From Swiss-Prot:
Keywords: Calvin cycle, Carbon dioxide fixation, Lyase, Magnesium, Metal-binding, Monooxygenase, Oxidoreductase, Photosynthesis. The basic functional RuBisCO is composed of a large chain homodimer in a 'head-to-tail' conformation. In form I RuBisCO this homodimer is arranged in a barrel-like tetramer with the small subunits forming a tetrameric 'cap' on each end of the 'barrel'. The record marks K334 as: Transition state stabilizer. Its cofactor is Mg(2+). Binds 1 Mg(2+) ion per subunit. Belongs to the RuBisCO large chain family. Type I subfamily. The gene is cbbL. It holds the Pfam family RuBisCO_large_N. Mg(2+) binds at K202, D204, E205. It catalyses: 2 (2R)-3-phosphoglycerate + 2 H(+) = D-ribulose 1,5-bisphosphate + CO2 + H2O; D-ribulose 1,5-bisphosphate + O2 = 2-phosphoglycolate + (2R)-3-phosphoglycerate + 2 H(+). This is Ribulose bisphosphate carboxylase large chain.
């Protein structure tokens, strides 16, 4: 169906139930404006439901429609405010699923509010009965809307200047075990890891303020460790102090205490919610603090490819919201992420402009209107033996976090940190010399290990350990041959 079937005139407002595609939510001739917000949904209609009607229903229920005609539409600029589904395509290699392109007038959204944006785009419509499943795959956010957001509080360039670290990925580690350590022992882990050569250590997502370690105790021991490690190494160090708490008042209190102790970075979890994230981002910019976001909880709605929200959308929202770091996948680690999709996430974080790239899952051009860049973080199941792969796949502007790959080292935590630092420095040197470090990686590491016992022990311990499972979320596109004329 390529023509509009919208009912016009007085018949449009007759009382009763009308198909969404006839109410103006299906407009195949519509040309999206530069100022429109565009959403791409993967729609899976119930058996027997017309995909055009299902897609029009998504447009309607995520903008101005309800289940019946209401005469109060005539008191508004109804034709302007209706979301318009203008294109529906079958999803390649996925029978019964359709890509629905929907345009929303910018006036439908409050400036600078992820909460308001998401209330429409992923609100009630996700429970709509005529749909088996619904997934928000991607969005095009107009420059006029992007400019209403703060963007990353610090950004990659200023973070590197603040840390005085250039020309290589940053190195970190999550303290393990994530729960159960006393404050004193927690601080010992932080000191050993930083002294051994890491740039950062990190609280895990669920370490807040528990009976075995109060948050204030953790902050004090951690910052004592940071200061000692800085004095011992002559380098600037940091530890992500997780300020996540039950209320905003408590989070602000913890953040202020971290600032008083001289921390350069604090951390929050995605589960605190979009408004809380934006609030902490504003605090971080005001107080010259790097803000790390752990994406705890995201896989509950990002991992399944037919229902939920793609992580590429969450990455876009978090760049708008103003965090400086976000976990974005490792490819070779233990967590979900295929190479092409993960590359798309990293592009969203680090580029000023994202051209559409279906191979990477990017359906739209996206201009970031000079917002600061967001530093992606790779963590979960990575180790020194993968350094050449990580540098090749993820690039230079990334934090590589080796938690188990540092703290699980057979010679101890400091040795684990040293192994990772030496492996990285060896790989960066090889890259700068123009060597084919991707294919020569194992040889480069083996040579570096000849003069670094901790690296040799790491390579002997983890060898070729990798987590090679089929990804559940891969790009949907069908390559077609080009014809040269």
């Amino acid at each position: 169906m390529n023509e509009s079937v919208t009912v016009r005139g007085k018949d449009r407002y007759k009382s009763g139930v009308m198909e969404y595609k006839k109410m103006g939510y299906w407009e195949p001739d519509y040309e999206p404006k530069d100022t429109d917000v565009i959403a791409l949904f993967r729609v899976t209609p119930q058996d027997g439901v017309d995909p055009i009607e299902a897609s029009a229903a998504v447009a309607g229920e995520s903008s101005t429609a309800t289940w019946t005609v209401v005469w109060t539409d005539r008191l508004t600029a109804a034709e302007k405010y209706r979301a318009k589904c203008y294109r529906v395509d079958p999803v390649p290699n996925s029978p019964g699923q359709y890509f629905a392109y929907i345009a929303y007038d910018l006036d439908l959204f409050e400036n600078g509010s992820i909460a308001n944006l998401s209330a429409s785009i992923i609100g009630n419509v996700f429970g709509f009965k005529p749909l088996k499943a619904l997934r928000l795959e991607d969005m095009r956010l107009p420059v006029a809307y992007v400019k209403t957001f703060q963007g990353p509080a610090t950004g990659i360039v200023v973070e590197r200047e603040r840390m005085d670290k250039f020309g290589r990925p940053l190195l970190g580690a999550t303290v393990k075990p994530k729960l159960g350590l006393s404050g004193r022992n927690y601080g010992r882990v932080v000191y050993e890891a930083l002294k051994g050569g890491l740039d950062f250590t990190k609280d895990d997502e669920n370490i807040n303020s528990q009976p075995f370690m109060h948050w204030r105790e953790r902050f004090l021991y951690c910052m004592e460790a940071v200061n000692k490690a800085q004095a011992a190494s002559g380098e600037i160090k940091g530890t992500y102090l997780n300020v996540t708490a039950g209320t905003m008042e408590e989070m602000y209190e913890r953040a202020e205490f971290a600032k008083q102790l001289g921390s350069v970075i604090i951390m929050i979890d995605l589960v605190i919610g979009y408004t809380a994230i934006q609030s902490m981002a504003k605090w971080a910019r005001k107080n010259d603090m790097i803000l790390h976001l752990h994406r705890a909880g995201h896989s509950t709605y990002t991992r399944q490819r037919n229902h939920g929200v793609s992580f590429r959308v969450i990455a876009k929202w978090m760049r708008l919201a103003g965090v400086d770091h976000i976990h974005a996948g490792t490819v070779v680690g233990k967590l979900e992420g295929d190479p092409a999709t993960t590359k798309g996430y990293y592009d969203i974080c680090r580029e000023d402009y994202n051209p559409a790239n279906l191979e990477h899952g990017l359906f739209f051009d996206q201009h970031w209107a000079s917002l600061n860049k967001l530093m992606p973080v790779a963590s979960g199941g990575i180790h020194a033996g993968q350094m050449h792969q990580l540098l090749d796949l993820l690039g230079e502007d990334v934090v590589l976090q080796f938690g188990g790959g540092t703290i699980g080292h057979p010679m101890g935590i400091a040795a684990g940190a040293t192994a990772n630092r030496v492996a990285l420095e060896a790989m960066i040197l090889a890259r700068n010399e123009g060597r084919d470090y991707v294919h020569e990686g194992p040889e480069i590491l083996a040579k570096a290990a000849q003069t670094c016992t901790p690296l040799k022990a790491a390579l002997d311990t983890w060898k070729n350990v990798s987590f090679n499972y089929e990804s559940t979320d891969t790009p949907d596109y069908a390559p077609t041959p080009s014809v040269s004329v």
